């Protein structure tokens, strides 16, 4: 059927508004006794806000004590009773976080290249292989 162009027509009044029926009025009030639903942002809004927040910030994202325990645990395999200066642990943490951020940036690019927005283990493997870290 062919499309026809619609022209504006002048309104000639229309019907008067009717009174609400009792059933409609009862339906509009919440039946749960006025319990308000908690506000939820649309999917992705909070994620984008977090991305902007963490891109602006420079503080360390991994907690200091768990990272320190991990460093000491790994160092135990090489030599027992090793001591660390506090600045040494902070330097290791800075380097580790910088490495991880770079790896996740490359991983995200791999996912985007595959026309996806979700990163997968195969993206991390590809990013490391391209970097020459893993054959």
Curated annotation (Swiss-Prot):
**What is said about its interaction partners and assembly?**
The nucleosome is a histone octamer containing two molecules each of H2A, H2B, H3 and H4 assembled in one H3-H4 heterotetramer and two H2A-H2B heterodimers. The octamer wraps approximately 147 bp of DNA.
Q: What does this protein do?
A: Core component of nucleosome. Nucleosomes wrap and compact DNA into chromatin, limiting DNA accessibility to the cellular machineries which require DNA as a template. Histones thereby play a central role in transcription regulation, DNA repair, DNA replication and chromosomal stability. DNA accessibility is regulated via a complex set of post-translational modifications of histones, also called histone code, and nucleosome remodeling.
In Swiss-Prot or TrEMBL terms, this protein is called Histone H3 type 3
Q: Which SMART domains match?
A: H3 (SM00428)
Does the record carry Acetylation as a key word? yes
Superkingdom to which the source organism belongs: Eukaryota
Q: Work out whether the entry's keyword set contains Phosphoprotein.
A: yes
> How is it modified post-translationally?
Acetylation is generally linked to gene activation. Acetylated to form H3K9ac (11%), H3K14ac (17%), H3K18ac (11%), H3K23ac (16%) and H3K27ac (7%). H3K4, H3K35 and H3K36 are not acetylated. H3K4me prevents acetylation. 32% of the histone H3 are acetylated with, on average, 2.4 acetyl-Lys. They are all continuously deacatylated and re-acetylated with a half-life of approximately 2 minutes. Monomethylated to form H3K4me1 (81%), H3K9me1 (16%), H3K27me1 (25%), H3K35me1 (25%) and H3K36me1 (5%). No methylation at H3K14, H3K18 and H3K23. Methylated by a protein complex that includes Mut11. Set1 methylates specifically H3K4. H3K4me1 is associated with silenced euchromatin. Set3 forms H3K9me1, while H3K9me2 is undetected. H3K9me1 is specifically associated with silent, multi-copy transgenes.
Query: In the UniProt record, which is one GO cellular component term?
Result: nucleus
Q: Which organism is it from?
A: Chlamydomonas reinhardtii
* InterPro entries per the UniProt record, alphabetical: Histone-fold (IPR009072), Histone_H2A/H2B/H3 (IPR007125), Histone_H3/CENP-A (IPR000164)
Gene3D superfamilies membership = Histone, subunit A
Give the Phosphoserine positions (modified residues): 11
> Which residues carry the post-translational modification N6-acetyllysine, per the record?
10, 15, 19, 24, 28
Q: Which GO terms describe its molecular function?
A: DNA binding; protein heterodimerization activity; structural constituent of chromatin
List modified residues, type Phosphothreonine. 12
Leader sequence segment: none
User: Where are the residues marked Not N6-acetylated as a site?
Assistant: 5, 36-37
Q: Where is this site: Not N6-methylated?
A: 15, 19, 24
